[in-house]
C-alpha cells in the first residue's frame, strides 16, 4: 500500500469545504444472497482510484475522488487516471481502450442506474463517472448519514421483514450501520436454505442492540473494578503502615524504659557507695 493511501486510511474524519465529516468505521453489513447500492452519495464520501490488472494510477494523480459541495450543489472532485504498467507507457501517455468499457459495469456490487427522484438530492452527489481502465469493483468510504439499499441477487426473491436499507449512524460514540431487515429466498425452492435461519437470528439480535451501549457499560464496570482494586490496595497499604508505626512506638517506649532503668540503677549504686 502506498504511503498516501495508508495515511489517508488511518484518518476517521475528512474536511469538506470547512465542514468536518465523520467517516463510517466499517462497510455496510453483508446480507446473504443480496447486494447493496447507494442511490446518491453524501458530501464527504470518497472513492478509491483503483485500476484494473495491468494498469496503475499516474504518479501525480489523485488517490481518490471526493464528493464535495454544499446544500445547493455537490459534485465529485479530482479525477482518476490509469496508465499501462508496460515499460513503453509513461505517466503522460494515457492509452484509451473504450471498447473494453462497453458492456461492462465498473460498479461491482453497485449499479449505476439512478432513480429520477434521487439524483438531485441536495448535499449529495450522483454516481461518479467511470474512467479508462477502471477496476471492476469500486471501493467507497461512506460518511455518517449515508443510506444504502439492498436487493436480492438474480435467482432469489426478497422476503422483506422491514426496510431493505442500512443507514450509517453514530451510536454510543461510534459510527455504525443499522441492520437491514431483508432475507432472500431461492426462486427454485419454497423452503429456506439450511444456513438461512442463523442470519435471521443475528439480524434480530443486531436490531435489538441498536439503542444499547454495551461498550459504555463494560467500561463503567471495568472502571468500578479498577476503583475497588485501588481502594483495597490503599487500605492494605494504610493498614501495613499503621502496624509499622505502632511497632515503632512500642520499640521506642521499651527503649526509653530500659534506658530509664539503667540510669536509675547507676544512681542507686553511687548513692550506696557514698553511704
From Swiss-Prot:
InterPro entries from the UniProt entry: IL-2_rcpt_alpha (IPR015486), Sushi/SCR/CCP_sf (IPR035976), Sushi_SCR_CCP_dom (IPR000436)
Signal peptide limits: 1-21
Cytoplasmic side: 263-275
GO cellular component: a single term: membrane
A molecular-function term among this protein's GO annotations: interleukin-2 binding
TM spans (from-to): 244-262
Top-level taxon of origin: Eukaryota
Keyword Translocase carried by entry: no
Coiled-coil region list: none
Residue ranges, Extracellular side: 22-243
Compositional bias per record (Polar residues), positions renumbered to this chain: 108-118
Alphabetized UniProt keyword annotations: Disulfide bond, Glycoprotein, Immunity, Membrane, Receptor, Repeat, Signal, Sushi, Transmembrane, Transmembrane helix
GO annotation terms (biological process): immune system process; inflammatory response
Glycan-modified residues: 60, 70
Region: Disordered, residue numbers: 91-118, 188-213
Pfam families per record: Sushi
Cysteine-cysteine disulfides: 24-67, 49-80, 51-82, 125-168, 152-184
Domain called Sushi: residue spans: 22-84, 123-186
Subcellular location: Membrane
Membrane topology according to the record: Single-pass type I membrane protein
SUBUNIT field: Non-covalent dimer of an alpha and a beta subunit. IL2R exists in 3 different forms: a high affinity dimer, an intermediate affinity monomer (beta subunit), and a low affinity monomer (alpha subunit). The high and intermediate affinity forms also associate with a gamma subunit.
Function recorded in the entry: Receptor for interleukin-2. The receptor is involved in the regulation of immune tolerance by controlling regulatory T cells (TREGs) activity. TREGs suppress the activation and expansion of autoreactive T-cells.
Protein name as catalogued: Interleukin-2 receptor subunit alpha
Organism: Felis catus (Cat)
Name of the encoding gene: IL2RA
